[in-house]
């Protein structure tokens, strides 16, 4: 049987690197928040993000990374136009701009994700409809491609903990 010590070493190095990034995300102190108006829940690592001035829209929260060009937005609004998840996704792609390089777009009955590249940034946007599609909730984050190893596990955890409020 032929062995490949260099291949094993590289495989072990990749596994160790991935584990280190995941454990860093797990060790950080996470802030858990609930929006008072719409009741959605979100979380973020305290060491990575800090609140920044917002535009005064109720139900929205803006954060920026302390030592990076990463940005994080979470918000919700009343779906007065009665948009469906598919209609709103189509509207975002056709009107909001920056969706030329979509690499990931899973969807469910009441939610969808758009993720991809905008220049040197990776974006991840999850939209969830709640309360019989009366409320639209969004989590959006963008971060430098060069910092993917640091942010990918963080985004995974943020996405897992993002939830809609009760109706």
Residue ranges and their predicted role:
Residues 2-11:
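Bacterial N-terminal signal peptides that target proteins for export
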Residues 11-20:
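Bacterial N-terminal signal peptides
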Residues 26-56:
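N-terminal "mature-domain start" segment
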Residues 42, 46, 86, 90, ...:
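Solvent-exposed, polar/charged alpha-helical surfaces in well-ordered, non-transmembrane soluble domains
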Residues 53-153:
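Conserved polar/disulfide-associated segments of primarily extracytoplasmic proteins
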Residues 165-167:
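Short, solvent-exposed mixed-charge patches
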């Amino acid at each position: 049987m032929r062995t490949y010590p260099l291949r094993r070493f590289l495989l072990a190095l990749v596994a160790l690197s991935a584990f280190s990034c995941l454990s860093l995300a797990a060790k950080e102190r996470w802030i858990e928040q609930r929006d008072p108006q719409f009741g959605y829940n979100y979380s973020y690592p305290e060491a990575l993000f800090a609140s920044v001035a917002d535009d005064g829209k109720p139900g929205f929260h803006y954060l920026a990374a302390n030592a990076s060009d990463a940005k994080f937005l979470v918000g919700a609004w009343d779906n007065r136009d009665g948009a469906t998840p598919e209609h709103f996704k189509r509207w975002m792609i056709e009107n909001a701009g920056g969706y030329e390089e979509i690499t990931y777009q899973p969807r469910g009955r009441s939610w969808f994700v758009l993720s991809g590249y905008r220049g040197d940034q990776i974006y991840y946007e999850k939209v969830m409809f709640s309360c019989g599609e009366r409320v639209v909730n969004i989590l959006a984050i963008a971060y430098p491609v060069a910092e993917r190893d640091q942010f990918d596990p963080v985004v995974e955890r943020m996405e897992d903990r993002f939830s809609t409020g009760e109706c």
